[in-house]
Curated annotation (Swiss-Prot):
GO terms (BP aspect): cellular response to epidermal growth factor stimulus; translation; translational elongation
Subunit structure as annotated in this protein's UniProt entry: Found in a nuclear export complex with XPO5, EEF1A1, Ran and aminoacylated tRNA. Interacts with PARP1 and TXK. Interacts with KARS1. May interact with ERGIC2. Interacts with IFIT1 (via TPR repeats 4-7). Interacts with DLC1, facilitating distribution to the membrane periphery and ruffles upon growth factor stimulation. Interacts with ZPR1; the interaction occurs in a epidermal growth factor (EGF)-dependent manner. Interacts with PPP1R16B. Interacts with SPHK1 and SPHK2; both interactions increase SPHK1 and SPHK2 kinase activity. Interacts with guanyl-nucleotide exchange factor EEF1B2.
Residue positions where 5-glutamyl glycerylphosphorylethanolamine is found in the record: 301, 374
Region span, G4: 153-156
Stated family: Belongs to the TRAFAC class translation factor GTPase superfamily. Classic translation factor GTPase family. EF-Tu/EF-1A subfamily.
Glycyl lysine isopeptide (Lys-Gly) (interchain with G-Cter in ubiquitin) crosslink site(s): 385
Post-translational modification: ISGylated.
Name listed for the protein in its UniProt record: Elongation factor 1-alpha 1
Residues binding GTP: 14-21, 153-156, 194-196
Gene name of this polypeptide: EEF1A1
The keyword Acetylation is annotated on this UniProt entry: yes
Length: 462
């Protein structure tokens, strides 16, 4: 095997008909984890249904359908390789819960790939005031996805086909537009592609001799290339937060005969090791970690991104639950939040939101009603500048600083300290009505919580 490639996560955004599925399908198809047999099966089905021209998107549709039905499909299907990276597509919009997934998401995307369609009239539709493209790009930026690649797709359907003029016009528009959101266009690779025909996807296109390649300038090193695959190869690798204190939000807690209580979750920051004494917030239970395992193999340490189960002593299944957060009892242990201040963006709420609104935000794995206790100020959503003090209400499109109070004990952190525990989505009326980033947390000084015997022993021994 040699040295493993670095894993990176991307999120693909863009308007409904921009050709996201075809483009993504093409990459997975050509560089991915789908075996020949599956592809032949898909091609045959697509042809039988008269969808021959749709085979790449068909791949993605099949995968999506399985995802929606909750079949845990072979996740390798959502992966592909570049020369430097293993790339996982963590989500593509169009999926009902896209926005929620992007926020509570199993992982933070390292880069967003924005697909815009170059076809006559298509680009204009996708980027119009109420186009989803704006929303998705703004979300990506707000949630800390600071790298962006733009694929100008369907170059084969411009007037005339492969028109340089049309491409340049679009690059100009998109640059203005992403700049308003906060991205610096100089750091963004723009690539003219056809996800369907394969132009500039993996190989330079003979149809666009005028395209001299893309260039990005950034302080961590400049890069240039011709294809979309090369642009993905030039993503700056993420630094995984191993140096921060441990934070592990629980997804489930199992009781396993002969072993005992096994909380399961994903290490978001820090390192989890057997022998560590961990504290669970907000329940304030402290105990020793006996063992840590992933895919049924014992680990000597679990790092950020690892989904693990760990065995804890003298703790019953009733003591800890989904939404609790485990941390190192000696290094900034997690605590209950009495309240928190957040910057929220209202996405689509039919009415007005005023103080007292109490929706149920999804923050990491917690799902607890929180009251908008005070609307402190309305702000400009790009610059963050204050527009108005103490607004009476908020409506769609507004950004604001609000004080929130959880209805039941919960543990959250500020976005700057622990990003995955500091962003949330507010779902209401079957849609995401707002997203938020936590600015500050009012932590409740914990009283004497439950400290198990094994934790006391482990602490004495040290």
């Amino acid at each position: 095997m040699g040295k493993e490639k670095t894993h990176i996560n991307i999120v693909v955004i863009g308007h409904v008909d921009s050709g996201k599925s075809t483009t993504t399908g093409h990459l997975i198809y050509k560089c991915g984890g789908i075996d020949k047999r599956t592809i032949e099966k898909f091609e045959k089905e697509a042809a039988e249904m008269g969808k021959g021209s749709f085979k790449y998107a068909w791949v993605l549709d099949k995968l999506k359908a399985e995802r929606e039905r909750g079949i845990t499909i072979d996740i390798s299907l959502w992966k592909f390789e570049t020369s430097k990276y293993y790339v996982t597509i963590i989500d593509a919009p169009g999926h009902r819960d896209f926005i929620k997934n992007m926020i509570t998401g199993t992982s933070q995307a390292d880069c967003a790939v924005l697909i815009v369609a170059a076809g006559v009239g298509e680009f204009e539709a996708g980027i119009s005031k109420n186009g989803q493209t704006r929303e998705h790009a703004l979300l990506a930026y707000t949630l800390g996805v600071k790298q962006l690649i733009v694929g100008v797709n369907k170059m084969d359907s411009t007037e005339p086909p492969y028109s340089q003029k049309r491409y340049e016009e679009i690059v100009k528009e998109v640059s203005t537009y992403i700049k308003k959101i906060g991205y610096n266009p100089d750091t963004v690779a723009f690539v003219p592609i056809s996800g369907w025909n394969g132009d500039n996807m993996l190989e330079p296109s003979a149809n666009m001799p005028w395209f001299k390649g893309w260039k990005v300038t950034r302080k961590d090193g400049n890069a240039s290339g011709t294809t979309l695959l090369e642009a993905l190869d030039c993503i700056l690798p993420p630094t995984r937060p191993t140096d921060k204190p441990l934070r592990l939000p629980l997804q489930d807690v199992y009781k396993i005969g002969g072993i005992g209580t096994v909380p399961v979750g994903r290490v978001e920051t820090g390192v989890l090791k057997p022998g560590m004494v961990v504290t669970f917030a907000p329940v304030n239970v402290t105990t020793e970690v006996k063992s840590v395992e992933m895919h049924h193999e014992a680990l000597s340490e679990a790092l950020p991104g690892d989904n693990v189960g760990f065995n804890v002593k003298n703790v019953s299944v009733k003591d800890v639950r989904r939404g609790n957060v485990a941390g190192d009892s000696k290094n900034d242990p997690p605590m209950e939040a009495a309240g928190f201040t957040a910057q929220v963006i209202i996405l689509n709420h039919p009415g007005q939101i005023s103080a007292g609104y109490a929706p149920v935000p999804d923050c990491h794995t917690a799902h607890i009603a929180c009251k908008f206790a005070e609307l402190k100020e309305k702000i400009d959503r790009r610059s963050g500048k204050k527009l108005e003090d103490g607004p009476k209400f908020l409506k769609s499109g507004d950004a604001a600083i609000v004080d929130m109070v959880p209805g039941k004990p919960m543990c959250v952190e500020s976005f700057s300290d622990y990003p995955p525990l500091g962003r949330f989505a507010v779902r209401d009326m079957r849609q995401t009505v707002a997203v938020g980033v936590i600015k500050a947390v009012d932590k409740k000084a914990a009283g004497a919580g439950k400290v198990t015997k094994s934790a006391q022993k482990a602490q004495k021994a040290k």
